[in-house]
Amino acid sequence: MCGLAKKLDIEDTLTSLSDQENESLAKPMNDAAEWEHSFSALLEFAADNDVEGFRRQLSDVSCINQMGLWYRRQRFVRRMVLEQRTPLMVASLYGSLDVVKFILSFPEAELNLSCGPDKSTALHCAASGASVNSLDVVKLLLSVGADPNIPDAHGNRPVDVLVVSPHAPGLRTILEEILKKDEIISEDLHASSSSLGSSFRSLSSSPDNGSSLLSLDSVSSPTKPHGTDVTFASEKKEYPIDPSLPDIKSGIYSTDEFRMFSFKIRPCSRAYSHDWTECPFAHPGENARRRDPRKFHYTCVPCPDFKKGSCKQGDMCEYAHGVFECWLHPAQYRTRLCKDGMGCNRRVCFFAHANEELRPLYPSTGSGLPSPRASSAVSASTMDMASVLNMLPGSPSAAQHSFTPPISPSGNGSMPHSSMGWPQQNIPALNLPGSNIQLSRLRSSLNARDIPSEQLSMLHEFEMQRQLAGDMHSPRFMNHSARPKTLNPSNLEELFSAEVASPRFSDQLAVSSVLSPSHKSALLNQLQNNKQSMLSPIKTNLMSSPKNVEQHSLLQQASSPRGGEPISPMNARMKQQLHSRSLSSRDFGSSLPRDLMPTDSGSPLSPWSSWDQTHGSKVDWSVQSDELGRLRKSHSLANNPNREADVSWAQQMLKDSSSPRNGNRVVNMNGARPLTQGGSSVNPHNSDTRESDILDAWLEQLHLDR
């Protein structure tokens, strides 16, 4: 009995031991399943941004860095897989900003921990999550020490796996610039900065979690020194649909001229509240507002003081204030190709999307504007030449031209290029010295005394040449000229070069003199001073001495475009005769034949043309006896009973030149021969020759005085 009882006690002991072992083995298995379920709930709370549920579910702080399986789509592969993730990774993936802040409040949290087959970090998850709060999460992770240079299993850094929301296309640029920085971004920069070059606005808000979608709004203040801070709007102000707002991507609002000279420059006339980002006009206090480059002379170079916060010069600064003033400047707008090409979806793009949209660059400046030096030089030289040509009497260019100086694109009323090209204007005729000598001589003074008798038959041909020369400078002829009608800095120099290189141009010295600034200024001053005192080449009745005749010839020479040319072919002989004479006489009145009198127009050739019209095609140059008589009587004292001729100079010359035996001779004003007091004619050979020369000189002087 005792043995049986002992055997039963041993069996009971073994049974109790086996039950305890089974219980001890089953407890860890139950704890593992319970922990796995608990950790999965923790990851769910992290994905939903539920801070309270995450805090209740977190039983131990050591679980912060634990890894659990998370069902998600594998990156770069269209399939769903289970991957190991920490709570910080899941919260960063879905943009759960509150949970991320709660996890980072524990010092045990590891920021750069990598796990799973892809070896991703929390920064990789935040960059590839495409959440609306991804920028905030990335900045927060970087601010507490996350390393943006850690590669994953495929060698990709966080910047290489960026995925952004389609509602915020401009977010990629911001994230790329932030993640490329190797330095840690501090919290004070996040709170104080308001400019990265772009500002963001909320597009829509979810009623479930209050999260907002961000998109690139407009360019605001210039970049701060670190260039990483942006301004956020937690919610977007809802505006009613306004059909009157123009589409800034189509129509006239997308043209180059509007973008450069009107976009965000012209003030908006809408008095009601509307969306500024969809309006192409400027509004008070708008960051995108810019100065008119036609009124304010500034370059496309960014202002260094404005980048630091403010510029003391304000609108008078010579540099660009902001991104819009820099890239919409006529010197830089659409001078480069857009990297996105035709697939660009920007509302306002500063670049060209095809080669046809590229604006031409000027070789002298390397920008889309002409050189200001070339523009001013062309404008000054053209104005000087136009002024000189218009003030010259008898010049074909004296007629009023519809010529205006070229307008500078960056100056007053200036136009930039491509769409703001040079205005189409008529070009004044280039009358350079030494060219068209025959036309110059026709415009100089011409009278019957200067024309030899054998050349009188050529007057009709001279008149035809003068009319032909006038027709060549008429507007009708200039319209059919091969000379280009557009005036720009390049072809103006070509016009002068072509004129100088032409075969009819021979005086190289005159070119350098006429194109020099000193010659042009001196000529203009002389023309203005002598404009009122200019007389007709034939109407010289106010000139009573050879000195006045010389001054008159000098005035005619100064008024000619060819200042160094003689006034007429006989000018040299006239100067020699006037220099050798010291005679003076009074004005005897005018009794010249009607055909030799000057006309009202003052043209020396008009009498010959009128003869041709009145007498037929053949000109009668014979001298009638009655005309000769009138010519003689016109200079006699009998024809002027009220006036006495001053012939003292002739008597003095006769006394000085005559011999003692003929010293008592006097001059008969009606004849051409010397007479003695007794009336008999004395004709010694030497005396007759000398007296004949004196009378010839006297008659020539009378013709000159008339």
From Swiss-Prot:
Keyword annotations: ANK repeat, DNA-binding, Metal-binding, Phosphoprotein, Repeat, Zinc, Zinc-finger
Positions of the UniProt region annotated as Disordered: 211-235, 396-427, 545-616, 652-692
Residues in C3H1-type zinc fingers: 302-324, 332-356
Comp. bias (Polar residues): 397-427, 545-560, 600-616, 652-667, 677-686
Pfam (any one): zf-CCCH_AtC3H23
Comp. bias (Low complexity): 211-221, 580-592
Residues the record lists as Phosphoserine modifications: S568
Listed GO CC annotations: cytoplasm
GO BP of this protein: regulation of DNA-templated transcription
Chain positions of ANK repeats: 83-113, 118-150
GO molecular function: DNA binding; DNA-binding transcription factor activity; zinc ion binding
Entry-linked InterPro entries: Ankyrin_rpt (IPR002110), Ankyrin_rpt-contain_sf (IPR036770), Unkempt-like (IPR045234), Znf_CCCH (IPR000571)
Protein name from the UniProt record: Zinc finger CCCH domain-containing protein 56
Organism placement in taxonomy: Eukaryota, Viridiplantae, Streptophyta, Embryophyta, Tracheophyta
